[in-house]
Design a protein with these regions (language model features):
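Positively charged, low-complexity terminal tracts
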Residues: 1-93
Length: 93
C-alpha cells in the first residue's frame, strides 16, 4: 500500500555518504515501502543535498517503533541542549 505520507523540512548540517561529508539542505521523512529493509512499511529518512546529485544522500529505514524511539531520543536530547544553550546565554550576560 502506498501511503503518500511525506514530510520535507529544511536542514542546516552535514551528512556522511559514500564520498565523504557533504552539506545537508533538507531531510525527507516518509512512511512507505522501504527500498532495502525487509519490512512491509517503514519510516524512511533521507538526508540530502539535491544540488550535489544522488550521491549526496544518507538514507535510513526504520520500523515504526524504532522511529518512535528515535523521535523520543531526539526530543530528550533537544530539551537537554536547550537547557545547555540557555545556561550558556545567561553566563554571557
Amino acid at each position: 500500500m502506498c501511503t503518500s505520507i511525506v514530510e520535507v523540512v529544511g536542514a542546516d548540517g552535514a551528512g556522511k555518504g559514500g564520498d565523504g561529508w557533504f552539506d545537508l539542505t533538507h531531510p525527507v521523512v516518509s512512511y512507505d515501502h522501504p527500498h532495502h529493509a525487509l519490512l512491509e512499511e517503514a519510516i524512511t529518512i533521507d538526508f540530502v543535498n539535491a544540488a550535489l546529485g544522488p550521491g549526496a544522500r544518507v538514507a535510513v529505514e526504520l520500523t515504526l517503533e524504532s522511529a518512535k524511539e528515535l523521535s523520543a531520543a531526539l526530543a530528550r536530547a533537544i530539551a537537554a541542549a536547550e537547557i545547555e544553550e540557555s545556561a550558556r546565554l545567561r553566563q554571557r550576560r
